[in-house]
Design a protein with these regions (language model features):
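Short, flexible loop/turn elements at secondary-structure junctions
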Residues: 267, 271, 289-291, 312-314, ...
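Long, C-terminal catalytic modules of enzymes
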Residues: 358, 378-392, 401-412
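Generic recognition of stable, solvent-exposed alpha-helical segments in well-folded globular domains
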Residues: 255-258, 262, 303, 318-322, ...
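Post-HEXXH active-site segment of zinc metalloproteases
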Residues: 300-303, 313-322, 330-361, 497-501, ...
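Post-HExxH zinc-binding segment in Zn-dependent metallohydrolases
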Residues: 336, 347-387
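Type-3 copper protein
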Residues: 1-286, 302, 309-311, 342, ...
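Catalytic zinc-binding patch centered on the HExxH motif and its immediate surroundings
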Residues: 286-305
């Protein structure tokens, strides 16, 4: 059998990435040529995945109600008259997510239980793509489509919400009839009576729920963002389940519109390079539920280049910096589809922006994304005033150092390819230009505390001293040995899978700068509580400048709850503020050793004494 999709005009030729792209992208510049190459590779990649889905589906679901060849035949017809529409369907982020998930299912013998739809229905998303292409191009035809949770999806357009809930059982089927131009509306045949789709699919009418497109940029030539609340694959790996969530309400859409316009204005005014990156690479925003202050939720996926999940933050600055961050993830995902930057086994390492150990690829992604964050705050802090400016200075100081430290790790790592080393070297040169930029004393001090805090908490959570060496160290202490002659203890990475969110003291530092009255209210509410929730009380004492009282609070807490991981780092910070150098250094630089030794020699005792003893022992070379 000949392949019915062999003639789609997206050319599967050789893609070449010039060295200048590495240089430009590392510096945050997305030239028109680089953008064209990113999207050309994505189209080729997804077309290959469509071929694979179609070939496998013929063998795995040959008798299904939605044969893949009928969808590909319709896509071919669309491609002959409007190849640009087929190109946009291939570039649609949901296409990549669906293709990867469906290929995994087609290559697996496992039968997934409900509510996961049967394989034929998941393959049927290909029919939804073809139907959307027919509607957009005016190609007449008839095609059957799957129904998931009363919804019929038309990617890049929206969805139809059927008026009646289908009976329990397998997903239902409907038929879409697309007429020739000028001969009437498109009809969705549901078995009893047809539903007419509106002539203008940009506007809601009846059961039709269109996607929202928002002109975020003051430049009319920049494409709008699509607020994606309809596609079943918008949540990346979630699949077509629980898709019947309500569409965005009018007030919700207006909230996104207002903040996106404000973010677009400030990006074009003060961050033109970042604005250009957004315009070239970020197309789809998937709204998430509102998140707490200073914890805007956002995510990207390597098979959904051009898309980002994010919650709507409070300010235009926070939305702008989140968009910059996610756009950089999309750029790097697109670049990694062109050439390898990392090869071989990837050790798990510390990343300041994550609570869990990350592979080398995660460090590269984070360093690139947070370089954009640091550069944003580097510029934006000078346009802000008073508390907002102090917070921006803090963010710049934190992420400037975090990125520089991570890039230093990457440059010494053996896993970078030649292209990867070129990219990281250029990114390092860009970040080095920020080193001498001054930051006011108060936010600079808080940034230093934040960085020390993040690393110390990570060490307590994910490093474990070699047990035999820790036992030998405990024996030396119990025997009254001089700590200077005690055995060295190396620590090994032992990830705690439950620890993925960085410690909450970062939120308190940001609150101290942005809204100190709110921090005072939290302090009064916390009172003098002791127990599992008491780290908040001790943390508030530390952040409000009562370091001596914070030391006592952490001591009390750890005596009763040594499992309070962040309290070990908090105690180290409080001791440093009071001038106790040896113990504080041990708690901030080797907290996992202090904790292990304390458990072996002085449970219930004074953790400061244990930390002081560890601080005078020889330190083993890092083998994290």
């Amino acid at each position: 059998m000949t392949e019915p999709h062999a003639d789609i005009r997206t050319v599967l030729g050789r893609h070449r990435t010039p060295a200048s792209d590495l240089d430009d992208l590392a510096a945050g510049r997305v030239t028109p040529g680089a953008a064209r190459r990113i999207w050309a590779v994505e189209r080729s990649r997804r077309l290959l995945m469509l071929r694979a889905v179609t070939d496998l589906a013929r063998r795995r679901v040959p008798a299904g109600p939605l044969p893949p060849d009928s969808a590909m035949d319709l896509l071919l017809r669309v491609d002959r008259v409007r190849p640009d529409i087929v190109a946009e369907l291939l570039e649609h982020p949901g296409t990549g997510v669906w293709a990867v998930r469906t290929l995994e299912r087609l290559n697996s013998a496992e039968r997934l239980p409900a509510p996961v739809p049967p394989l034929w229905a998941e393959v049927g998303y290909l029919h939804c793509l073809a139907a959307a292409g027919a509607l957009r191009s005016g190609i007449g035809g008839t095609i059957r489509l799957p129904v998931h949770d009363t919804l019929v999806t038309l990617p890049t357009l929206g969805r139809v919400r059927l008026p009646r809930t289908p009976p329990p059982g397998p997903p239902a089927l409907v038929t879409l009839r697309v007429p020739a131009p000028g001969t009437g509306p498109a009809l969705l045949l549901t078995g009893d009576r047809p539903l007419a789709l509106p002539a203008d699919l940009r506007r809601p009418r009846g059961p039709w729920e269109p996607l929202h497109r928002i002109a975020w940029s003051p430049r009319p030539q920049d494409p709008p963002f699509t607020l994606e609340d309809a596609d079943p694959y918008r949540g990346f790996r979630a699949g077509p389940t629980a898709t019947a969530a309500p569409a965005l309400t009018g007030p919700e859409t207006r909230g996104w519109h207002l903040l996106l316009r404000a973010a677009g204005d400030l990006l074009h005014t003060r961050h033109p390079r970042a604005a250009k990156m957004l315009a070239e690479t970020l197309r789809v925003l998937v709204p998430l539920p509102t998140a707490p202050r200073f914890r805007t939720a956002s995510a990207s996926y390597n098979e959904a280049v051009g898309s980002a999940l994010l919650s709507l933050p409070r300010t235009a600055q926070d939305l702008a910096v989140t968009l910059v961050h996610e756009a950089r993830h999309s750029v790097l995902n697109g670049l990694l589809h062109q050439l390898a930057l990392i090869e071989g086994e990837e050790p798990l390492l510390y990343a300041p922006w994550r609570g869990d150990p990350r592979p080398l690829s995660g460090l590269l992604h984070g360093a690139y994304a947070f370089a954009g964050v640091a550069d944003f705050w580097r510029v934006e802090r000078h346009a802000l005033r008073e508390r907002a400016a102090e917070l921006a200075h803090f963010e710049f100081a934190v992420w400037r150092t975090a990125v520089s430290e991570t890039l230093a790790v990457l440059l010494t790592a053996p896993g970078l390819t030649d292209a990867g080393r070129l990219f990281v070297t250029r990114l390092t040169a860009e970040a080095a230009t920020w080193d001498q930029e001054p930051v006011p004393a108060r936010p600079a001090a808080l940034a230093r505390a934040e960085l020390a805090d993040l690393r110390a908490v990570w060490r307590v959570r994910h490093l474990r001293p070699d047990p035999d060496l820790a036992d030998a160290l405990a024996a030396a202490r119990r025997g009254g040995a001089d700590p200077r002659t005690a055995p060295t203890v190396r620590s090994l990475t032992r990830p705690d899978p439950g620890a993925v969110v960085p410690d909450p003291r970062g939120e308190l530092r940001r609150l101290l700068l942005a809204d100190p009255d709110a921090l005072d209210r939290q302090a009064r509410a916390a009172g003098s509580a002791v127990g599992p929730g008491a780290p908040v009380a001790a943390d508030l004492l530390l952040l409000r400048g009562a370091a001596a009282e914070a030391v006592d609070a952490y001591r009390t807490l750890l005596a009763e709850h040594p499992e309070a991981v962040s309290a070990w780092a908090g105690l180290g910070l409080a001791l440093r503020e009071t001038g106790v150098r040896t113990a504080s250094a041990a708690l901030l630089e080797r907290p996992e050793v202090v904790r292990a030794l304390h458990a072996r020699t002085a449970p219930g005792g004074d953790p400061v004494e244990t930390a002081d003893w560890v601080g005078r022992t020889p330190r083993a070379p890092e083998q994290v």
